[in-house]
Regions:
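Flexible "cap/lid" loop of the alpha/beta hydrolase fold
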Residues: 111-115, 122-152
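Gly/Ala-rich beta-loop-alpha elbow adjacent to hydrolase catalytic centers
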Residues: 102, 106, 110
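Conserved alpha/beta-hydrolase catalytic His-Asp/Glu region
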Residues: 152-210
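Active-site loop/oxyanion-hole signature of alpha/beta-hydrolase fold enzymes
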Residues: 59-101
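An N-terminal hydrophobic leader/cap segment in hydrolases
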Residues: 1-11
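Conserved HGGG/HGGXW glycine-rich cap/lid loop of the alpha/beta-hydrolase fold
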Residues: 20-67
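Acidic catalytic loop of the alpha/beta-hydrolase fold
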Residues: 219-223
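Conserved small/polar residues in nucleotide/adenosyl-binding loops
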Residues: 230-233
Length: 233
């Protein structure tokens, strides 16, 4: 199934270029922001199911990631969020209420967007959120992917990294996940990690007027159980 071919593609301003959005369905607007080194396909198993429930599913390629052009300076959560906010408000009528969902790096950008949306925001929902400040690194277990690698080495590195960082069960590290990871990594220009390591999401929480919902995986290595929840408290 070609999920992308069934979407409507829209473009909004992004630095000196364009930000790319994919849209499925009609109804209540819900906006999804993907994680670092990703694109809209982080949500590929969710978009059509959610659209079928009566939502207008609007999924970003964040600035400097996926098919979107580079954001230009400042390379901060605020600078990127301003572009995303402009895109959302360009795509939707002025009086639209919006549900916003962010994954990992996308939750940090989403927090700043949530502040800007003010009373238009219906809910802010984060999955595997970053933006709580520095956290224990697992870099020693990760393999840096570089141009000198053979294709087999690139595949092995990507699969190792997904097993450590993204997918707790090895059987889920299949051909589709590996292709997505390498394809998105090759296109990534925005350095998401420095932004993810800030406290920008934590700082934004008191300013977000809508209900906030958060979920982390029980086996999520980046948070070591409930450590980020304890920080937020």
């Amino acid at each position: 199934e070609d999920i992308e071919s069934r979407s409507q593609v829209k473009r909004t301003l992004c630095g000196n270029g364009q930000m790319v959005w994919h849209i499925w369905g009609e109804g209540v607007p819900i906006v999804f922001l993907h994680g670092g080194h990703g694109d809209w396909s982080h949500w590929c198993r969710n978009v059509e199911q959610i659209a079928a429930e009566g939502f207008k599913v609007i999924v970003a390629d964040l600035p400097g990631l996926g098919a979107s052009d580079d954001p230009g300076p400042p390379y901060t959560a605020e600078g990127i969020a301003e572009i995303v906010y402009y895109g959302i408000t360009s795509l939707l009528p002025e009086n639209s209420e919006i549900d916003l969902v962010g994954f990992s790096f996308g939750s940090v950008i989403g927090a700043v967007v949530a502040e800007k949306l003010d009373i238009r925001l219906k809910s802010f929902n984060v999955v595997g959120a970053a933006g709580f400040g520095p956290r224990e690194r697992i870099a020693n277990s990760m393999v840096k992917i570089h141009k000198a690698m053979s294709e087999q080495e690139r595949i092995a590195a990507a699969q190792n990294n997904m097993r450590w960082l993204m997918l707790a069960h090895p059987e889920n590290v299949g051909e589709l996940a590996t292709f997505m990871q390498l394809f998105n990594t090759d296109r990534a220009r925005t350095l998401s990690r420095p932004i993810s390591m800030t406290t920008r999401l934590l700082d934004a929480l008191p300013n977000i007027l809508a209900p906030v919902n958060a979920v982390w995986g029980e086996l999520d290595r980046t948070v070591e159980g409930l450590s980020l929840i304890h920080i937020s408290e």
